[in-house]
Amino acid sequence: IKLHNIIANISLKALQNDSINAAIKRLSVDEQSGFELRKLSLKVIANNKGMKIENFAIEMPGTEMKMDTIRMEYDSLKALNHFADNVRFSFRTLPSHVTLNDISAFVPALSNFKEKLDLNIDVEGTLNQLNCRTLEINAGDKFRLKGDVSLQDLSRPQDAYVYGHLTNLSANKEGIGFLVRNLSPHYNGVPPVLQHLGNTSFHGEISGYFTDLVMYGLFRTDIGSVQTDLKLSSDKAKALFSYSGGVKTTDFELGQLLGNKQLGKITFNLDVRGNHYKSQYPSITLKGLIASLEYSNYKYENITLD
């Protein structure tokens, strides 16, 4: 780590063996990897039983985040040696927006996300038993995420477990473009198959580890709905993304999705298993029943895949 352009204005009002009263009026710094902290300010009051952080605000090139009072509770100062399990805290964001590219020095995968997101979160618990009672992420009317999330063992990312209930995850046509544009390393426009979905939304649950997530719920689009019960897995060492589970739909407009006028609606209940290795064609296996498929103005029924 190499820091430069450091500007600091720190006020220490009181310091004793078991208490502190201090304020960071301004702290700004640049890091050689590209991270730029334009301003950090806060006031902290702490003793051997707890800590209170007020007026917390942080600014980066595309981020302005403010928080209500951050409160921490612990049995003694020794608890700080085991912060992840023994320090209970709570905080709530005030109106804030973030640009994920601002932290790409630490999370390179976010380097393409250069547009702002409005953020509203309300958190309580310990680092290893965290409950996010409110989670709202919006990009105007284009994209919305609303729900609540519980996280376990965040101090050990490889073992971290997440459970989330999504009451609203939605994107309109412009929102799909927003996501593709900010998540794609090489943006070449929105693929037609995604454009054809129209307005989309997902209501359901996610659970599992960051490398093995189960997604259960209903995915709605302008051309039909799909019920999903899928496990999504990733293996960076093998450059592999895989998925398996069940998908079913009734009268989904397959022809509109693929831009094929010969195809019409499809109804199916299938088990799917797919493997996607980097720089290779995907391998997909389907088993189950296609109850009906319209093709060239004729309906085919009861097609079994095994």
Label each residue range with its predicted role.
Residues I1-K142, S155-D306:
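Extended amphipathic, helix-rich lipid-handling scaffolds
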Residues D148-V149, L232:
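Conserved two-metal-ion catalytic palm core of "right-hand" nucleic acid polymerases
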